[in-house]
Amino acid sequence: MCLREFVSESVAQYLHDMGNTPPDDLHQRIMTEVEAPLIATVLEHTGGNQSRAAEILGMTRSTLRNRVRRYAL
């Protein structure tokens, strides 16, 4: 299964489980839930090399450092 299909199915299941009361600001909720483990996994993959992790993630090292602090990684 590709990542796009996984996300689509997961969001559909989440909305189904919520029934008639879907959460406000679903986009922000999903981004918060996904971004922290994404960054942690890429940092682990790079052995903690923030420059390489930032390159893989397509962000600046400064942005990566801010996110690491935000999520206490």
Regions found by a protein language model. Name each.
Residues 1-2, 9-73:
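Bacterial C-terminal helix-turn-helix
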